[in-house]
Every structure is written in C-alpha cells, then in structure tokens.
C-alpha cells in the first residue's frame, strides 16, 4: 500500500507538471478513479454546406472547433454526436458515416490526463437554424482554405479537418483509424 501511495503521488506530480495544474487537483482525480483505466470517447460532427464545414466558437476559451463532446455512459456514439450538434448549434442532424477514429495522443497535442479516442462523424442537416448555446457564442461555416486562426487544436487539428473534407468529396473512402 505504501509503495502504491508513493507511485500515485509521483504520478500526480508528473501529471500536474504536464497538465499545468496543481498537484492536489491531479491527486484528487486519481483518488476518484475506480477500477481499470479505460479511454474516454469524444465525438465530433462534420456538417457541410456549400463546400464549407460547420464550426462553433467556445464561449469560455474563444476557440473554434467542430461541434461535439464526451459520450455519456449508456449513450451510443451516433446519439451523442447528434445531441452535441443540436445543443451547440441548433441544427438537428443525422450521422451518415464514421469518418475516423483517432487516438488523441498520436496527433501532436499535449497529453490529456485520461486517454482519449476521438470519433469523427460526417453528419447531414435535417432541420433547425443556427443558435448559440451556453457553451458556444458563434456558429459559422468555413472553407478548407479559410479556417479560423484561433482553432482549438486540442479538439480538432487542421489536418483532421482536411481529412473530413477529403471524405466529404470522396464518400466511398473507408473509415480511417490509428
């Protein structure tokens, strides 16, 4: 038990250093973790209109990203991406293809405390109108050569967006994965 506690403390110190947070914050997260460690799942929706992709700007960080978020326990990936797009944009959509499943740690971003797999879906608008939310303060469509400079690369990278455009123009391509 003493060895385990010492290792957990060292891990908290390392996590705090790389996550740029207090050691106590990481130690508390470790204390809350129960059971076998498994990855978290993040969904992102690629919605296209007039050869542009739908993006939202986060109210808190003022960074642009694709609409999306964490999959809740008991929720399917397609239900999660549909819900997230509706909540963040006002558009009701239908997922038509799983474009990619990526390991977040392999895409050049600073490591996240938990391991994250990102699921990118191509979705079609069924109905609705642009509407901001508690999480988003702007909604816009962007061309592939005119992406916003303040992109939330922790959520989506420019190369991932270009992959989504490639699949949009070539719908018969297979799903990509790491």
Regions flagged by a language model, labelled:
Residues 3-9, 16, 55-56, 79-84, ...:
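A broad, low-specificity signal for short, low-complexity segments enriched in glycine/proline
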Residues 16-33, 63-64, 97-111:
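Charged, low-complexity, helix/coiled-coil-prone segments
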Residues 164-178:
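Acidic/histidine-enriched, glycine/proline-rich intrinsically disordered or flexible terminal extensions
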